[in-house]
């Protein structure tokens, strides 16, 4: 016997198979193999733990209210973390859910934030106003163009051009 498992599994999706153990007096963390799951494990488990062990405050998180552009279904029983693309439309912030899945790494680079679906909920409704934790500065949200409708390959070309500007704009299409 090498040690003991302190906790295995958290009620979050992605990120469920996270692990903390004591191995010969040392704290050992086990992160899931899928990249998005590993990121959730770090943000929800390891970052607060490292802050606590180092006697420091956890990094400040910016939370804003966003209006969802579409319904986001979910299964009850786990808190789901959904990456969202956020942009300003008029005087409000709107959030479009991105693809889901523990291995969907492109959503991490395309997202400006995360929305949490509580573990007792079966999802969130279109037009619901919910908190979103930003992964970018709030000022960056004003440099995102939001496009709603069917996707066209021309939009990908436009997005590339906008990112190549001296002061880049992000392009978020739904």
Features from the language model and the residues they span:
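Flexible glycine/proline-rich
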Residues: 2-137
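Domain-level signature for soluble enzymes in the chorismate/prephenate branch of the shikimate pathway
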Residues: 137-174
């Amino acid at each position: 016997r090498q040690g003991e498992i302190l906790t295995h599994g958290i009620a979050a999706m992605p990120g469920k198979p996270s692990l903390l153990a004591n191995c010969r007096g040392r704290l050992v963390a086990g992160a899931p193999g899928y990249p998005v799951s590993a990121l959730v494990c770090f943000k929800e488990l390891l970052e607060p733990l490292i802050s606590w062990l180092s006697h420091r405050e956890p990094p400040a998180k910016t939370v804003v209210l966003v209006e969802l552009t579409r319904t986001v279904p979910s299964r009850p029983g786990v808190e789901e973390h959904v990456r969202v693309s956020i942009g300003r439309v008029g005087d409000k912030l709107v959030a479009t859910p991105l693809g889901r899945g523990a291995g969907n790494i492109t959503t991490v680079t395309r997202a400006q934030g995360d929305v949490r679906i509580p573990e007792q909920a079966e999802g969130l409704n279109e037009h619901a106003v919910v908190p979103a934790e930003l992964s970018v500065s709030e000022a960056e949200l004003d440099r995102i163009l939001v496009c709603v409708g069917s996707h066209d390959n021309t939009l990908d070309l436009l997005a590339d051009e906008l990112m190549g500007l001296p002061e880049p704009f992000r392009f978020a299409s739904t």
